[in-house]
């Protein structure tokens, strides 16, 4: 081979290598250009097969990032470094879309670039240089079509977290960016592709813990996440919970359960639950009305069924939860809660964020299991709103209360009482307060079994504001109506209620300053709740009363409260009622139950002649001449007998000793003369009856003090009351006061006519229908007054008392107890020989005063009885018939007793704990409103 051929071959090889190097450089440049263009322009890369699938399903898969769908704003912010092309690829009909550019407000310009593989051409060029070198270059040219389109969008305000303030604009108007082939309608024509509307029903940041709701239950709502799922914007919702309307709007930060409610500048989240308090209610409906003050509602099965009516029909707006639940409430009868009041610009609740705005087109309330689940959510705002909403649901709805218990909601609420945030434990306590009120006693037991009482006490000791303290004490008041919880409250809550509420806010001071005026009573509603709770537990048993009496400062503060209220001319308040009823219960059996009670006991007076009006024979034995001569004389001619001074004390009385001191007696007298409330009158008369019971030193002093204060006429006036309980209490007090001889004379002169008027029969009181216990109490009082009191017996005959007594015996429609009590009075009257001739002249026969108790009616008594002329003893026995009223009837302990040491005492206690609603016409009661005090009295 000659040199020219070698040189030509070398030249060709060099040319080829140079061309290869240039081609490689060009290829790298093209790839770099492609990579750069792809990184800048590519948004969506859809293959024809995927595109056909998307068009067939009518949905579009959006990029998923960090557990949520990425919207336009997210794609603008995302990094492009993760988009790489790893070498040459088969770009089969790729579609590229540029990032939209906002040309002007409301418009976005998008550029679409499309490659046409069919139109790709290869261009080959051959170049020969002067030295004979041939250079061949092959270049592939692709056909690229660039299209620019403009679309109009509605700006969506963004929040600080990058998500829209109102998600409805995104969920309803979001247009996924696609290639132009896919941005056509079904007929091939141009048209935007609209993504599926969101289907979330609760806030986008509402996530449950991995274990469902943080706990599992053996029964009730399931704890698995499949049942309720995540409550974020991309939550997985079961079909039965999915909204039925296509125009359903995704919740926004303005919705009811938004995680971070907006509060004015300088405000705090605590302001969300600030309400202007009204008088405390048995149940509170702590909610605010949103959406133009229309109330919310749910179907009876907590369903979310689509309501009928046009979208403009206001009836489609959800009404209050209690509306037509279980068909328990008639249609169109709603129980409105007072609207929350704004305080210093704060928001009463999250509902008010949307006040004045139209409701969402397809909003649904969360179901009861969902609300209970929200109590375990990690955000405090969700917990507090769920608790407040649960309190609203339970208002006047026993079915919901029972369902909350069955769904294990009560343990969660009790656990929230220890939560550090006020809005959380306040809402939980409010829900427990409503749950604890009602006919279902199992709710109270459930709270007790969850250690609810100790939890309430812990919260009470930490509470420093009136609103929270009021709810806590109201809940304890509700719980105290159940017998099995009373001692638990005494053991755990007594000292906390006394030290944290009664003493600090009563105005009483442990070291009083004589020069200082009485302090004003603070937090009256809280004191009312606390006194009502202690009033209930004081009827439990002697052990409870002993602990209450010995609680340091309790009796002192109670007496101070009543004195202060009387001084303010407010003797008819509920606070006075609860305090006086509590003092009455603490005075029950006080002569027996106080420490060292034996030092106050007095011996029974000796009776010189046991044969008298109370002899075993109806007509008695012959009396001595001295006895008959002394019968008509006044036994208290000596003026010294009309005045009895209380023992002198070296130190002021404190604690339980105040229960039988002159100052407390004057309180009862003032209430008898000034108060118009039947319950207060009854309690005052009952307290006097208790203090005058038994043979003890202070009982004798108090009987005399009441006569000196001219209280006998005030008590006798109560016999004309229209309220049976007041009449019965006054009758019992007069009976005990009649033990004093001087009192007996005055009562016989002034009270016998009123006592006779209250007996059944005759025309004067034909409309009255007193119970058996009241009639027996009146008869026993009459017998006590006329015994050894001839003038009183004559007064009885003059007021047609004989006719009524005989009618009770012979009518055949009275109970055995009434017949026996009337027979005792008739026997006492016939025992006076001075009255026999006048009675015979009036047509009465001896047989009218002889009563065969064997023939008495036994319809209301099946037990054996004592066939004697002595009063029947029905010691500590309650009436079989419960009066149709809210208050607990005063028991008839000792209404017919043999010994003065055991009778004449009364204890005010609740007999039927199932009655929780007050009825009109009851003593001092009213229909419980959303702000009315709890009417649970003992």
From Swiss-Prot:
Site (Essential for interaction with cadherins): 401, 478
Keyword ATP-binding included in the entry's annotation: no
Region (Disordered) location: 855-938
Residue positions, PTM N-acetylmethionine: 1
UniProt entry keywords in alphabetical sequence: Acetylation, Cell adhesion, Cell junction, Cell membrane, Coiled coil, Cytoplasm, Isopeptide bond, Membrane, Nucleus, Phosphoprotein, Repeat, Transcription, Transcription regulation, Ubl conjugation, Wnt signaling pathway
ARM repeat feature ranges: 358-395, 398-437, 441-475, 476-516, 534-573, 583-624, 653-693, 700-739, 740-780, 781-826
GO CC annotation, single: plasma membrane
Residues carrying Phosphotyrosine: 112, 217, 221, 228, 257, 280, 291, 865, 904
Location of cross-link Glycyl lysine isopeptide (Lys-Gly) (interchain with G-Cter in SUMO2): 421, 517, 882
Highest taxon above the source species: Eukaryota
Gene Ontology MF terms in the entry: cell-cell adhesion mediator activity; protein domain specific binding; protein phosphatase binding
Modified residues (Phosphoserine): 4, 47, 125, 225, 230, 252, 268-269, 288, 300, 320, 346, 349, 352, 617, 713, 811, 847, 857, 859, 861, 864, 868, 879, 899, 920
InterPro entries documented for this protein: ARM-like (IPR011989), ARM-type_fold (IPR016024), Armadillo (IPR000225), Plakophilin/d_Catenin (IPR028435)
GO biological process: one example: cell migration involved in sprouting angiogenesis
Compositional bias segments (type: Basic and acidic residues): 875-888, 909-922
Role this protein plays: Key regulator of cell-cell adhesion that associates with and regulates the cell adhesion properties of both C-, E- and N-cadherins, being critical for their surface stability. Promotes localization and retention of DSG3 at cell-cell junctions, via its interaction with DSG3. Beside cell-cell adhesion, regulates gene transcription through several transcription factors including ZBTB33/Kaiso2 and GLIS2, and the activity of Rho family GTPases and downstream cytoskeletal dynamics.
Assembly mode: Belongs to a multiprotein cell-cell adhesion complex that also contains E-cadherin/CDH1, alpha-catenin/CTNNA1, beta-catenin/CTNNB1, and gamma-catenin/JUP. Binds to the C-terminal fragment of PSEN1 and mutually competes for CDH1. Interacts with ZBTB33. Interacts with GLIS2. Interacts with FER. Interacts with NANOS1 (via N-terminal region). Interacts (via N-terminus) with GNA12; the interaction regulates CDH1-mediated cell-cell adhesion. Interacts with GNA13.
Domain remarks in the Swiss-Prot or TrEMBL record: ARM repeats 1 to 5 mediate interaction with cadherins.
UniProt name for this protein: Catenin delta-1
Organism: Mus musculus (Mouse)
